[in-house]
Amino acid sequence: MSETSNKKLKITQYRSIIGCSKKQKATIKCLGLGRPNYSRVLNDNPLLQGQLRVVQHLVKVEEVSE
């Protein structure tokens, strides 16, 4: 079937959600962020890629080696 990826991504929020749509605010909350300069390390998957596409102007994404 499909190969599972062990790739991890560090997601850092660098812009505030003030003035953003409800969908973008909810996506930031689902990612576990909430304020500028908060970071999370999450496993890469298609769901995460879709969420990042919604808030690409608010976050920075870096690949992390384990």
Swiss-Prot record:
Keywords: Ribonucleoprotein, Ribosomal protein. GO terms for cellular component: cytosolic large ribosomal subunit. SUPFAM superfamilies: Ribosomal protein L30p/L7e. It comes from the Bacteria. One of its GO terms (molecular function) is structural constituent of ribosome. GO terms for biological process: translation. NCBIfam families: rpmD_bact. Part of the 50S ribosomal subunit. Belongs to the universal ribosomal protein uL30 family. This is Large ribosomal subunit protein uL30.
